[in-house]
């Protein structure tokens, strides 16, 4: 059964919300705060919900996380804040993400950047996704002049482009972006900053530069040599769904991969009408990097998962018609804790298929990726500064693709480092 | 072991000690019959009105006090029964015929001013109808009390004696006096009632209260056409007050007591019995859950008695009383120290906040989020053991 995944915000749910909020023990130095990458004062906002000051709850959330609503929808809370809830030891943890969604959906709130005395220093933020926006808002608060460059015509990056509607409804995203105080930041939409622009102009005009451009190049597959139709990479697939280019699927859809994006693709395929949606992953369930709750929901909705298979051939005339997998076995790896996989000779599986989606992860794009190049090794993991340069990084571009909340945390951290760098330089 | 829940109370035999108090659950004959079918040992009819023009009810008249969505008390502004005495007399006669093994008391009297003939007349007619006893409502804290009845009678020993004298002179059935909590020198009032011939005392009634205020419209609850009145608070919130009153009465007057106030379950009932009640009366819990709670009240009490080796309720009535002393008689040599069971602790830190901000700054949290108790600083107050959300985690131990 496919669930809409839309949040709790109705009066019917109010009773549940108040009861859930009343379970919170209001721990001293609560461990849940430590589990949240942006350290939202969780017990405080839950207590404000409990006493029906929903606006106060939302303020508490938004002060720490300008995308508090979006993160309420997208955070793998079971692996972050909720993991550390002390109530897990005597029963079930508080449903923190649901309460956060509720507060953000329910209350009206408009942020206003309280700006420190102006420094007349200029910072360029490249990328208008969670990391870039987060960094820009913080920097403005510190009193710096901020220019933000975004290659698309809209903000929010991956959240707007790829994350499916069933996980983050468009109106929630719009509302959250609408609540931001963006007037104090100069935002340049539709400007793609390539290596040339960065090195020749931006680096000369600005005192510091934050690079939070995300990952834009899908990891390639060499299986579609014949250029068969109906074979996509995950970005293409999700983006085409979001912009309406794909609005219906028929037959069998097979997604290759084991991350959150792969799970999104598989769940989306069912929603678009695929008769079967199969997720094929080369390792076992234990090694699968996707959030456990997401995988569970996918299975509940009817997504089928093939564990320990790796594709080696696509067949078809013009369109893809079949896919062949080899079975894999897992072998311990001396270097990393994660098990490696090997193909099992002779163990083959051929499946008819109508749509194939490769969700193998993404890389930095060639331009800014090459700009960073070997300098990646010089990034200070605490300050996110690239060597001793005026460049700072964060978000997926830096960490290779983590959660939205971690990108926001990166943006905040980089902003603090940039402030320190500018003021001490 | 054979356990019996039967109770002899002021000469009346009860099959179990659980009665419905004079309140909404005893609002009609039909209701009381259903309650007896469910197993209630007795019922006290909703206070009779001498003139039902005086018991015209307002709407709404019941409000509740909540905490986190759970009811901890009701507060009501309901008056005596709006049914005429004639109807009740017929109903009471029928109930006693159909349910001779269940105890039925009438409750007197909702009226304005104290008129001897009204009390005598009503008492006699009830006795003729066949009720097992009378309860004199000297305790209603709202409405009636504002017009000279209810709790205003119990505020004056002379009035207690006078009205009780009228009724005792008129009937032979047992007469129980229902006393309120908020009255000056309750033991003295109880003794006065006994001296004037009361066969039993019931306590307590609701506490005069203001249920709450609508903070957006500035109108207290319950709201009757945008106005309100002081109301009678009942339910779990008032149980500690009821226990205190029953204990005080039991310690001062040798008289059967029917305990009332916030009894929800068998443990509450046992507590009332341990401080001197030999029957108990219940209303609010029935208002919330219905007559069917008699099942868990009865089996819980039975199993408690089996476990404790009590054959009869009287075996344990009043057993807590010798343990209640004047404060200045309590030991000052008995010194305690808070201790933590680290295996049970979940690391919430509430004890450190409580001790830090309302105690003696004796509890700090360790790196691993476990309380570290400073034995020098701990003053044995016990607050930490009360606010700890985990069973048997923080306890007090004797200092050696």
Residue ranges of model-derived segments:
Chain B
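N-terminal capping/small domains of soluble enzymes
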Residues: 1-104, 109-116, 121
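Alpha/beta enzyme core
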Residues: 33-38, 42, 111-258, 264-271, ...
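C-terminal helical cap(s) of enzyme catalytic domains, especially alpha/beta-barrels
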Residues: 53-70, 212-231, 273, 285-310
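Extended, intrinsically disordered, low-complexity segments
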Residues: 66-71, 239, 247, 299-348, ...
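Extended, hydrophobic interaction surfaces within ordered domains
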Residues: 246-252, 266-324
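Short pre-active-site segment immediately N-terminal to redox-active cysteine/selenocysteine motifs
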Residues: 344, 354, 376-377, 387
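Iron-sulfur cluster-binding cysteine motifs and their immediate structural context
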Residues: 350-368, 383-400
